[in-house]
Amino acid sequence: MASKASFSPEEWTKVLQSVMMAGIAVTAAEPSGLWGTLKESMVAGHALLEAKSDTKSSELIKAVVADFETSEGRAAARDRLQATLTGSKPGEVKAKAVAAVRDAAALLDAKAPDEAAAFKAWLRHISQAVAEASTEGGFLGFGGVRVSEAEKATLAEISGALGVKG
């Protein structure tokens, strides 16, 4: 069983960051305005709550959730996120987020091979939930689509980065 102790502090921060980057990649693919962006960001937080109460969550997922419950864990993930994205142009954010997810997937495969598949499926689930959080296009939520073409393409990129089926 992999745990936080299976990773160096730098590696663990990459694992934590991947949870946020999985959602940021989708949000950056097609910004949804203020309300849509708020809904999409809330979904990632909700995924942490779901995983905490899900008895089927892997020990590694539970360790990540536990770290996000501490101010130190949140600060480490936030600081890494800022270091990765600060100074990025809007068009670069998605590419950097997908790259961070890809790096985390490789790290998980190397350090936690028994739990990597479940963790990567969880990251993909977060991405899908973010994509479905708000409608794209239309007016006041009418006439839009649940997942835009840009978001579908990004979900495919994330699936490829994770090595999972979308």
Question: Can you annotate each of these PLM segments?
Answer:
Residues 1-166:
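Small-residue-enriched hydrophobic alpha-helices in membranes
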